Amino acid sequence: MSFIIACEEGKRKIAEILLDKQEVDVTYTDEKGRSALHYAAHHGYLDIVKKLVLAGADVNYEDHQGETPLYFACLQRQKQTVDYLMEQGARIDIKDYLGNSLLHLTARTAQLALVQHFLKEGLAVDGLNNEAQTPLLIAVAYKHRPIIQELLSHGAQIDASDKSGDHSLILSVRSNNLPITQLLLEANTSVNHTNDQGETAMLVASINGNRMISKLLIEHHADMFLSTKEGISPIWYACTHNQKELVSLFLDHGLDVDYSKPAASTDSEFGSFIDWVENNQGKKNNFNTAAPYAGETLLHVAIKHGHTAMAKLLLDAGASINKLDDSGNTALHFAAANGKKDIVKMLLEHGADATLINNREQLAIDYANMNGFNEITALLVEYSPTTKNKPSLKAVPAKEKASESIGQDISSKKQALLDLKELLDAGILTQEEFEVEKKKLLA
């Protein structure tokens, strides 16, 4: 082991003495399968490398990971040692245990001269390692622009993808590298390529919140509507995560401010956010609201997540305030159910209709009452006094509405009186208002 240690540590004199005495087997390897030549090449000790080769060391001997002295020299950018070993017949068509060729290795370490040499010598420009990565994908991942340009000039497939389905553009966007992203787009990469998760470069840019790259992608016709298998598109992601600049960018490039999700068989077991509210009263379950439900607009989604500034941006852009989702819910239903007083107030000030009922014949005020949001109830009564007369928890079934014009039965009157009493106890109605409404019911 002393000879290998001497070579590894660059102790030239000791190595020379041992070699001169011919007491050393230069083919001896350590527990990793590495010879003295591996270590000398790794450190770039050219004089020792030459003595070992002259003494009979195998320039193509592979250690337990398939790495040769030439591989070690390339790994550490030992250009002179690399040149010498190749002069001595070192093979360049080797791969390590991960399947990386010398072209993969030099692309990762940004050794342009060696990349050019290996390409000239015929190494496959689109060779794959065990992860199906090409040298181009490696160069993009490590942000080596000159290497990328060299590989492309030799015909590298720009849209080759790895085992995850990621291609060069997705990798460059994921690393927030604007210059390389622009280079790839100018080289006509597929801007709407999707990986195995259904992610596009546009979605990755949205996840990163990178407005500059998002703008560049849109200018190259990236599709902002493409969704993952879970129904997440750049639009919904930006709105869900309160990325106002990105939503503004999308609106500037043609997104309809009332854009909504169409009905689909892949929707959750719950029909809507409101359904979840009703099924989880008093619980602390986390509602998975990453994807929108059928019919939900951008405004619904912003309010569902409590994003006041996003809701204001959409309203200022002309969003329809009373638009319904497929369950008949307005944005006001969402805000009331979510306990967002400021948003409720903003919606009412923008003309939200508090008298609209959903498919379950519930008003926004019903959900405020259901969850004990008394201040929101007061707001809704203030802006729409007619809601005071409606039962707070259950709506009157549609088949009974015709008979209400003639008179209510005893049970419905009793329920209405109880509801009025709740409003009185909560301080929402004064005693005088209570008496007036009571007389109306009993008339």
Where are these regions (language model features)?
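Ankyrin repeat boundary/linker residues
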Residues: 30, 63, 96, 129, ...
